[in-house]
Each structure stands twice: as C-alpha cells, then as structure tokens.
Amino acid sequence: MKDIDMGKEYIIPSPGYRSDRDRSAVPGQHRDPEEPRFRRTRSLECQDALETAARVEGLSLDISVHSHLQILDEEHSKGKYHHGLSVLKPFRTTTKHQHPVDNAGLFSYMTFSWLSPLARVVHKKGELLMEDVWPLSKYESSDVNSRRLERLWQEELNEVGPDAASLRRVVWIFCRTRLILSIVCLMITQLAGFSGPAFVVKHLLEYTQATESNLQYSLLLVLGLLLTEVVRSWSLALTWALNYRTGVRLRGAILTMAFKKILKLKNIKEKSLGELINICSNDGQRMFEAAAVGSLLAGGPVVAILGMIYNVIILGPTGFLGSAVFILFYPAMMFVSRLTAYFRRKCVAATDDRVQKMNEVLTYIKFIKMYAWVKAFSQCVQKIREEERRILEKAGYFQSITVGVAPIVVVIASVVTFSVHMTLGFHLTAAQAFTVVTVFNSMTFALKVTPFSVKSLSEASVAVDRFKSLFLMEEVHMIKNKPASPHIKIEMKNATLAWDSSHSSIQNSPKLTPKMKKDKRATRGKKEKSRQLQHTEHQAVLAEQKGHLLLDSDERPSPEEEEGKQIHTGSLRLQRTLYNIDLEIEEGKLVGICGSVGSGKTSLVSAILGQMTLLEGSIAVSGTFAYVAQQAWILNATLRDNILFGKEFDEERYNSVLNSCCLRPDLAILPNSDLTEIGERGANLSGGQRQRISLARALYSDRSIYILDDPLSALDAHVGNHIFNSAIRKRLKSKTVLFVTHQLQYLVDCDEVIFMKEGCITERGTHEELMNLNGDYATIFNNLLLGETPPVEINSKKEATGSQKSQDKGPKPGSVKKEKAVKSEEGQLVQVEEKGQGSVPWSVYWVYIQAAGGPLAFLVIMVLFMLNVGSTAFSTWWLSYWIKQGSGNSTVYQGNRSFVSDSMKDNPFMQYYASIYALSMAVMLILKAIRGVVFVKGTLRASSRLHDELFRRILRSPMKFFDTTPTGRILNRFSKDMDEVDVRLPFQAEMFIQNVILVFFCVGMIAGVFPWFLVAVGPLLILFSLLHIVSRVLIRELKRLDNITQSPFLSHITSSIQGLATIHAYNKRQEFLHRYQELLDDNQAPFFLFTCAMRWLAVRLDLISIALITTTGLMIVLMHGQIPSAYAGLAISYAVQLTGLFQFTVRLASETEARFTSVERINHYIKTLSLEAPARIKNKAPPHDWPQEGEVTFENAEMRYRENLPLVLKKVSFTIKPKEKIGIVGRTGSGKSSLGMALFRLVELSGGCIKIDGIRISDIGLADLRSKLAIIPQEPVLFSGTVRSNLDPFNQYTEDQIWDALERTHMKECIAQLPLKLESEVMENGDNFSVGERQLLCIARALLRHCKILILDEATAAMDTETDLLIQETIREAFADCTMLTIAHRLHTVLGSDRIMVLAQGQVVEFDTPSVLLSNDSSRFYAMFAAAENKVAVKG
C-alpha cells in the first residue's frame, strides 16, 4: 500500500477490524464498554494517532495482521504441515498467496528463484522503495508467530513455574520441526561435499598416475564431480532457506512478546530504557542469527567422523592424526567462541549503559545546553565508551582467532599426518596425499561455520536470559473489584500501598517542608509508627496474594505460578508510601486532592490506576479511566491524532473539546492547524500547550472516571480559570473527577476536598467543612489569600469585559473545517529519514580507513593478510613440490638388487622437506597472531573515532535538529549502527579480505598448473560481473530499507515506554501492540528479503564455481600424461576449495558493503549536521568576572525557530536594569519562553542583538555565555547518577556549599535521611523523586551557580502554595543581587516584581510596574489578573 498524505481520505488499516463481528472474534480482546460500536470500512478524513507515527517516517502500511489469522484458520483445517508439504512440489503455477515465497515450488524455493523478479526491478530502477517490497508473508507475521510462542511459554510456566521455566526449551520447541529438517538437509550437504573429494577426486588423481588413458571413464568421473557439487550446493541452499524463515518467525514472535510484556509492566525501573531498546533491536537480531546459523554446528562432528574413517582407510593408522587435529580444534574453537561470548555479555551491559545515557542526553539536550553541561555529559559517555571499547578489544582478539584458524588447521593436520606417516616408513603417493588434503579442505567448511554457529548460539543464550528476565517482571493489574454500592465509583478500605524498591529509593521517606517538621510527631500515633517498622518478607508475600484479590477469577494465577511469584516477590523490598487510606468517591463528584510536595498525591492516583502494590486493605473501582499525567505525554503524530488517540473523529465533539481546552488560538499559530506534526514529546510546543492537549485527549475519550494530576500547573491564570470552569466543571459535570492541584483557589468549587500529608489522608470534606475545621488546609488556604490579594480594588463587571477584551486582541480562533487539509512542508515538523542512494561511495570507505589510522595502517594490515594467506598457499605448494620430487631419483638397495625408488620416504633430503613444511606452520601461526592484534586495534580505533566524532557533532547540533529528528532515529545510530560498526563489520571485513586474497591465490595456483584454465575463467568472469552488478544493488537497497524501517520501530518503543501509565489508564495496550506489530512487520519484510538476497546470490555463484571445478576436472582428463600428478592434485584440491570459498567471498563482499551502510549513516550525520557556535572563541572571551552588573538589553531582536517558519519574536526592544526583578506574562505561545531561548542562544536571532553588560552575546562562545546564566526550568529535570552529580557535575563546590543550597530549598532533611546522603542514587528521569522535589533540586542547582542573571520558567508550578511561598522567599533572598526574569503563569508569583512585561504574538505590548498596570483597567495585565483574582477574592 502506498503512502497516503496526511489529511486526505483513506481507510484506516489499524486495528484492522472490518466489523463488530470481526472485532469480537479476536481472542483475548474485550470490547471497551465506553467505546461506541463502529465500522472501519468507510472513508474518514481523520487519522489514527498510531498510524501517523509511521507516516511521519515515510512508511507504507501492511494489511492488517488479523487477516493473516483468518487465512491461517482456513488452511489449518487442511492439516498442520499442509503449507510446508506443498513446497515439495517441484514446480507450482498457482499464485494464491500475496508473497512469492509462499507460491514457490521446491526448485524455486531452494534456489531462491522467486526473488529474481525483484532483482530485475531493482536493477532497472537503480533503487528500491518501500512500496516495491512485498509485505511480509502471513506465515512470518509477528502476530501469528507470537501467539504460538506465547502459548508455548504459558504452557512451560504452568508446568514448572516461573523459576524453573526454560525459555531455551520453549524456543527449541517453537523451531524444532524446521530445524530438524534443516539439519537433515545439512547432512545431505556434508555427505555430497565429502563424497566428491573422497571418492571422485581420488579416482581422478589415480587416473592421472595411470599410464593408459580411458576417456569415457574419466569423463564419467568429471560428471560425478559435477553432480556431487550441485547436490552439495542446492541442499545447502535449502538449509538456509528453511533457517531464514525460521529465524524471521522467531525474531518476530519474541520481539512481539517482549513488547507485549513491556506494555503490561507496572514500571520499567528494573530495566533501563537503554536496555529495553537494546533487547528490542540487538537481542532480536541475536535470536534470528541463532536460528539461521546455529543448526550448522551439527555438520561439524559428522564430517569429522567421516573424514577420520576415510583417512584411516587411505593412510592406515596415521590417518587418525589429521582427524585428531580437527577434532581437537573443534572444542578449542568452541572454548574460544565461548570466551568471545563471555566478553560480548560484558560488553552488552556497557552498551546498555551507553545507550541509556545517550537517551537521557538526547531527551534533555535543551537543559544540558542551558546549564553548559555538555562537557560533563560528554566525559560521562566517553568513560562508558572507553570501558565498552576495552571489552570489545578482548572479544575482538578471540573472534580474530576463530576467523583465522580454519585455513591453518588444514596445514597443521597435513604437516602432522604426512610427517609422522613418512617418519614411520609408510609410502605416500600424490593420489593419497592430495585426496587427504582435499578431504581436509572439505572438512574446513564445518570448521569455518563453527565460529559463526557457536558465536550466534552463545550470544543468543545471553539474549534468552535477558528476554526471560523481562518476561518474568511484574505486570500492572488494573483493579477488577467492583464497589459494593452502584453509586460508588472508587472505594479504598484501610489500604496501605507501596512502590517496589526498584521504583523508589526515597518515596517512602517523609517529605518535609519547614512547617511540617513541627507537626511530624503529632500526625501519627505510636501504633502507626510500629506498623511502619513491621516490614517483613512475609508481608511482601501477603501483599502479592492480596494483590491477586484484585483480579477476576480467570486472571488469578495457578497454584504453581502462585508459588513462583511468592519467591519472586519475597525478594522484593517494598517501600510503603500510602498508609490506611479510607476513601469512597461517589459517581459524578469532583474531588480535589491537595497537599505539600511529596505528600503522596500522585501515589494515590497511581494506586487507583493499579500501578502500586497493595499491602493491606482493599481497592475497588467501577468504570473506565481517562488520565492526564503530571508531565504530559505526547505522541509523535499530529495534534489531532494526539487528541483522538485512536477514537473515531466526531467533528462536533472535537470542536467542543478544542474550545473547552482553549486550543483554538494555538491552532491559528500552528502552520498546518490541527494537522501539524507536533514532534516527539511535543518538541515544538510549550509546557502549557502539551498539558492542554493531554487534557483534550481525556475530554474527547468520554470515560466515566477522570484522573487529572495537576493539569493546570503550567497554564496562564486566565486560561487555567477558563479550562477549570469550561472543561472540568461544565463538560465533566456528570463524570467522576479526581483533581490533584496545588492551586487551592480551584478547590472552592470541588464537591469534596482531600488533604494529604506524609502518605495519609489527614483531612477530608467540602471546602467549607475543612475551613471550619481550622486544620492544615485552612492555614494554607488563608496564607494563599493573604499572600495573593493585591492592593487594588477590582470590579467584577470590569473583570468580565477586560477578560473579553484580552481574548479579542489575540489571534482569531482557527476553525477546524471538514474539507481535506492540504499537507504542507511546514506542517510536517519531523523530517523523513534520509536514505542513501546508489552504491556506498568510496568516500565512506576512505572515511573508515582514515579513522582506522590512515592509508599506511591500511597498507600494513593488507600486507599482513597477504603474508598470512601466502604462507598457507606456500605450505600446500611445498607439499606438491615434495611429492613431485618423489624419491629424488635415489637408488635403493634391496638385498643384492638395486633400483630407483618412487617413494618419498626414500628421498635423501626428506628431513629438509619435512622441516620446511613444519616451519611454514610455525610462521603461519606467528603471522596470524600479529595480524589479529593489528586488525582488531585498527577496526576498533575506526569505530571509536566515528562514535566520538558523531557524539561530538550531535552534542553541538542546534536545537532545531533535535526538534525535527525523533530520538529513536538518533539512538538508532548509537545502538544498531554502532553495534554493526563495532562487532559485525570487523568480523565480516576480516573474513572478506582473507577470502579475497585466498581466491586470488587459488585461481593463481590452478592457472600456474594449467595456463589454459584462464581461458575458461574469462567467460565465467563476465557472468560473475553481471551477477555482481545486479545483486549488489538488490542487497544494498534492501539493507538500507532494513536500516530505515528500524528507526520508527525503535521510536515507537521509546514513546510507548514513556507513556506506559497513560496507555494503561486508557486501556490502549492492544492498539499500541498492533501498531508495533505493523512497524515490526514493515521492518521484517525488507530484512527477510535482504537475507534471502544473500543466498540468491550464493546459489548462482556456486554454479560459477562448479563450472570452474568441472573445467579443472576436464583439463586433468584431456591433458592426461602431460602434467605431473602432484600438480594435478594441487590444482584439483584448490578447485574444490574454491567452490565454497568463491560464493562465500562474494556474499561477504555484498554483506560487507551492506554493513558499510551503517558507516555511511554515521558519516552522513558527521558530514551534514550544522553546528552551533563554538563553546569558547579565542580572543573574544568575556572578562572572568563578567557580567558584574547584570544589565540585559534587547535591540530589535527577531527570532524564528526554523527557516520558513513565522517570527516568534518581532522587533523586541527593552532594557532591564541591573538587579531588577522582571515578571514576564502572556498567553501560551506569546513568546515568553522564546525570550529565554534567545538569551541562551538555543536559537540564534534572525535580526537585532542582545547585550549583557554592553557585550553582544553573539560575539562570545556559548559555554562562556551559558555558564554565566542560571535557569530554573518549567520541566524539572534530574539525570541518572547521584544527588551530588545532579547539583554539581564538575565537582566545583564543597560539600558545605551543597548542603547549604539544599537547606535553603528545604530539601536538606529529605536528602539527609537517605542512606548515602549526597551519593544516593538518582534514577533515570529522577523517577525516585516527586515532581515537586525535582523542582526543589533544580532550584538548589541554580543557587549553587551564583549567576548574575537568573531565568525562572514557572519554577514553582508543581508545588503546593505553602512551599511555593517559602521558595519565593528563598529566591528573593538568594538572588537579591541578581537580575531576575520570571516567566509566570500564576500571576501572584510576579506581583512582587519591579516591572512586568506583557507579551502578545511575539511583541512587548506592556512593560511597567505592577501598580501602574493594575490601576489601568484597560491594560491586558489588569484583564488577566482580574480573571485569576476574581476566583479567589470573590469565592474564597
């Protein structure tokens, strides 16, 4: 199916239901009672949000996975193996299947001829697009295979329990039938490959020694050689054909199972995001490789035994020696491969850390740049990379040994066998010697694939362990118990709940604001304290059992699972967070939840959503959820799709939701209205816009219970007021709403208020009841009134008109029309991923050579390779020379008779020949070791330099790059592409270079014996060139498509993990799983064809090499008596070696080029990424103590985020005096945050300039500028590491200074209670701190910097009013000497400012003192303030 432009009519392919009947037919899926019945076959002008993510990446969509199930059900009635057996028909003419591989007969299947039409298309076009590629066969679809694997895993769990369950056994059962078949085919390959040299070659060589010629007999021998080689080639191709399909099925199945599990997880804290991305990108690949190559290991022992028996027959007892060498090398190779795998396992852990840290850097790059912490993070990643490189180097040495050993084994085996054989006085003829060498050569195939097989199996073994640990992680259980009364929607009885320890290291510690410290002991009695201390494993087990009471009877685990889970849970350390919660929420009630920072508000709503573990009591819920998270989660899709969230488009409801959430003016600003791509995590939206979109999604979803976690914190006062009245009170009037907030003025209108403190509900009732109680709530509310009422009389009638006026001045609301929207370039924020075209340019190889050490290093490596292969070739030639010398015409006396001997043992120089032969072996081993070390160091230097340069360029890229590029795409460069360059490329390249030189030596040797052989090589060379031209384009283009389809697939995983709580709440797991399966199948389609294209080429190359061996055989026959039998033996042994080698080498050439596409992709970023200004500019550095005053001047400043976008700051001019405190207000999108962006030079000005203390900031380095500014951002950001590293990454401050900053932000006691104090762990995203605590730590961070200029971007939005007031006081005291710019949404935070700047549409419309602006009832600020103040003053 072709790409469809956004906004045009199309049929939604996902979730792929054709009717209500189809929908209910899908096993394991139940209809959401809230969702209306619908049919998805009519045209719609809207898009499913999950579809758009793919269209952003330029992907076509496969037909629905559910149609696969239907077709398979039809075929299942014909028998389990019906489809498999139908392949046995030699030729098939039917084309009922959509994928040609399913229509292939045996001949087409094993020679991969079904792929030829695609090869022709690619050759003609010169490139391959996604629409040219066949969708994945239904038999390979991830949905079909994952269901089967899941069933097998479930059976395993039920039989033996989670701890004893073996995922390896399950995987074996999944692949068993196909693997056994492939092993049978492999045995045929080995037998054919062995019988050719063993019998046919032996007779050919004996014929060369015979004096009489028999043309008919000799031609029959050549025909026999031809047939054995054809059988060997095609049966091997059939082995690969079976294995590749098995591998693709296994990869699709296990990755789908993994993602399905991720969607069910309570939280991902046991696994980092980096590890999960690696599991889904690299570990899936490992499973494929194990299925594809693992079975080839079975061929080794068979050939070794056959070879040993045959050699004994030919040579007698000494024949054991050669085979013994092979047999001893086999376990040695296994051991070395195991060592490689051991280092790979260690390396994977380092890679996980690096990818996780990279993900963190990319997610928060804006803040890293603002804090001027680029260097600190760069050093952190470099440190992890250095460790990874060290392990990679060790793994590389062992890997290099396994690659280089195979050709040497033949020589060692030959040297040992022949030396001992003749030393013991046995005869050795040319026929015997070269038959044995040829048999040894045929045995090397088994040895060559052994490192591949063992490496793939041992790496898959590591992957299986990682998958198993993921599959056994605890799942989230949405609460199934229903309250006793039908009018009650949520009921909690004496509930004590906990986060598991991996989720939080401090979540259970009391959160202390100064006021609380006094009441701490009074709040909780001794009885409760003792309950807190009773924290035993027994309770943890009880909790888990109790947790099962929340499930329906059909969801409760079996006794075996129960037992396994107890053990599993018993080992968890549960962190109590909520105590003795008693709560009943009636239907249709609006319940406000408030409390200080860290009091347990978010934990309470998480408990209702099933995210926590219930230790005591019970929870019951009746209804479906809509959830607005404290930090809004945005999909990488259009704004409309983010609101629809998979539901059908209803224009009336949609427009009504837009009005309720004040989104109309925003649509007018966006370039493509509501069809604008809003990027990953809402990259180009303000915090307020993201929050309102999240709220609009909840309103549109039309659920019965709404959980709103502080949804108005990032909004302007009048916008927040409008949304509270219009959206929450009016639209959700009949719904049950839990409304968490720090803005207490809204609680006046709630039906009920819950006040939380230290994990308990301490007060509960209506606003009036709590005020009469005169408890904590009343105290805080009174403080709010005292702190916020200004000295200005406000008339409520004036307020209404003022508010209206301010709305009118804004842009006219953009209406969402029903006509098709035209997709413009501007509307698409996220750029389609670039795809290389044509062959990989030579410049890419040159970049790699330069990175590896330059041309000289490359030359040294090539010389070492040539010496390596040359020493091997020399030893074989020396053997033939020795045989040709025979007895050296020496005369032997037997009794009284003398005669000329023909036996080599009688040669007087035998010792000399034998010594040189043995010496060649020693030289080979030494050269091999040197080459291994040099090559590994060279390739690792290349990959490390590429990594470092890429990382440097990414860190120095301007913000527009991160706004338009999904994190998954950049991460793909650092995970999948780096893995290719680190591990796969060196492995492939080493074998490729070695084999190319070996091929030239083979052809040279044969041509040396038969010059006429070169005549036959000519036509075959032309044929080979044509084949190479066609296949090279096919393989390269398919590899590029494989790379490109990987990015959206990774982006979807990242995005889904970040929004797990929202996906659970909306019960959208099934939709996200379908989307994932579509993206995975989109990736598997070119990936499967890429692997098949390799074999398509291999089969055809085999025919060329078979032609070469047949030509050699014919020349031996036709030139009978003209050449010595020793040289004939040399030629035929090399010809036999050439057959497998030739196709293997050309396949390696294509594969190595395909691997180089990863270097090309990395190099593309290195070459094309534009850089922001340098960190420091020589001779232009500002004075060390700059700025001393802190004066900020904007002169006609103009700024736009990207070319072709409208200006967001228009001719802005103003001067802020030193130490002045400025409040900046304005509607969302008015340009408030853009001022900060301009000041930090995150976006360079389009015109005008900014000066600080008279110095133009555009003239100095970015680090010089940013290190002198401090910011407390709207979105509090903590990085994984320690508390200390988050406050002071450069270790610039003393411990006392850090504790002082923590004390001033009221976090000292909280951090002091942690076991490791400042060295306590901070988890990814700071998830073990509440949002309010994170914000306090960000303020502490700013306090430490002692900067003259501070920007506060709504810094206290996530705090309760009391903490807010305390922090405001701290900020006023600490930054009294600083120039302060406060970007505010809650207007009371800026009333104490010296002046207030009002922005509208990127222009300064008002700039004066608060008293002047509030005394003018026609001012915008007056209107905005009136909207907020009326709420408190009138109703409070």
UniProtKB/Swiss-Prot annotation:
Domain named ABC transmembrane type-1: residues: 179-459, 858-1154
Swiss-Prot/TrEMBL GO biological process terms: cAMP transport; cGMP transport; export across plasma membrane; folate transmembrane transport; heme transmembrane transport; hyaluronan biosynthetic process
GO molecular function: ABC-type transporter activity; ABC-type xenobiotic transporter activity; ATP binding; ATP hydrolysis activity; carbohydrate derivative transmembrane transporter activity; efflux transmembrane transporter activity; glutathione transmembrane transporter activity; heme transmembrane transporter activity
Gene3D superfamilies (UniProt xref): ABC transporter type 1, transmembrane domain, P-loop containing nucleotide triphosphate hydrolases
Compositionally biased region (Polar residues): 501-511
A cellular component annotation (GO) from this entry: apical plasma membrane
Summary of the knockout phenotype: Mrp5 knockout mice are viable with no overt phenotypes, deficient mice accumulate endogenous glutamate conjugates in several tissues, including the inhibitory neuropeptides N-acetylaspartylglutamate (NAAG) and N-acetylaspartyldiglutamate (NAAG2), but brain in particular. Abcc5-/- mice show lower white and brown adipose tissue and increased glucagon-like peptide 1 (GLP-1) release from enteroendocrine cells of the small intestine, and are more insulin sensitive.
UniProt enzyme class: translocase
Region annotation (Disordered) ranges: 1-41, 501-569, 798-822
Membrane topology of this protein: Multi-pass membrane protein
Binding positions (ATP 1): 595-602
Localization of this protein: Basolateral cell membrane; Golgi apparatus lumen; Endosome membrane; Cytoplasmic granule
A Pfam family reported for this protein in Swiss-Prot or TrEMBL: ABC_tran
Transmembrane segments: 179-199, 219-239, 296-316, 317-337, 400-420, 426-446, 608-628, 847-867, 916-936, 996-1016, 1017-1037, 1101-1121, 1126-1146
Listed Basic residues bias regions: 514-529
Sequence positions bearing Phosphoserine: 14, 19, 43, 60, 505, 509
Disulfide partners: none
Keywords associated with the record: ATP-binding, Cell membrane, Endosome, Glycoprotein, Golgi apparatus, Membrane, Nucleotide-binding, Phosphoprotein, Repeat, Translocase, Transmembrane, Transmembrane helix, Transport
Catalysed transformations (reactions): ATP + H2O + xenobioticSide 1 = ADP + phosphate + xenobioticSide 2; 3',5'-cyclic GMP(in) + ATP + H2O = 3',5'-cyclic GMP(out) + ADP + phosphate + H(+); 3',5'-cyclic AMP(in) + ATP + H2O = 3',5'-cyclic AMP(out) + ADP + phosphate + H(+); N-acetyl-L-aspartyl-L-glutamate(in) + ATP + H2O = N-acetyl-L-aspartyl-L-glutamate(out) + ADP + phosphate + H(+)
Amino acid composition bias (Basic and acidic residues), ranges on this chain: 18-41, 545-559
Residues that hold ATP 2 according to the record: 1226-1233
Note: Although other labs have confirmed the ability of ABCC5 to transport cGMP in an ATP-dependent manner, they obtained a much lower affinity for this substrate. The authors conclude that ABCC5 is a low-affinity cyclic nucleotide transporter and a major function in cGMP excretion is unlikely.
Family: Belongs to the ABC transporter superfamily. ABCC family. Conjugate transporter (TC 3.A.1.208) subfamily.
Function: ATP-dependent transporter of the ATP-binding cassette (ABC) family that actively extrudes physiological compounds, and xenobiotics from cells. Mediates ATP-dependent transport of endogenous metabolites like cyclic nucleotides, such as cAMP and cGMP, folic acid and N-lactoyl-amino acids (in vitro). Acts also as a general glutamate conjugate and analog transporter that can limit the brain levels of endogenous metabolites, drugs, and toxins. Confers resistance to the antiviral agent PMEA.
Name of the molecule in the record: ATP-binding cassette sub-family C member 5
